[in-house]
A protein has these predicted regions:
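Cytosolic Rossmann-like ligand/nucleotide-binding regulatory domains
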Residues: 10, 14-78
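Long, charged amphipathic helices and adjacent flexible linkers at domain junctions
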Residues: 1-11
Length: 78
């Protein structure tokens, strides 16, 4: 089965990001990538399988497995 459209991608939350201060649920990252948020890197801390209630902060790196094109598009928007 062809799964070329699936990608492990990272999304950096910066000072200008419209999702900073929102929870993972509120950010709609899951819906916008047709994927799963599998981890968040916050400084030296790595949080695997974060809760949807986790608040996204500046400099967080969000790791997502999902639709390749949608992850790339979201990176431009965020």
């Amino acid at each position: 089965q062809d799964i070329d459209y699936i990608k492990l991608g990272k999304i950096l939350i910066n000072h200008h990001s419209p999702v900073k201060g929102l929870t993972i649920r509120e950010s709609e990252i899951r819906d916008r990538t047709d994927g799963l948020v599998i981890a968040v890197r916050r400084g030296d801390e790595r949080i695997l399988n974060p809760e949807s209630s986790m608040i996204l902060k500046v400099d967080d790196i969000v790791w997502v497995v999902g639709n390749r094109k949608k992850i790339e598009k979201l990176n431009i928007e965020i």
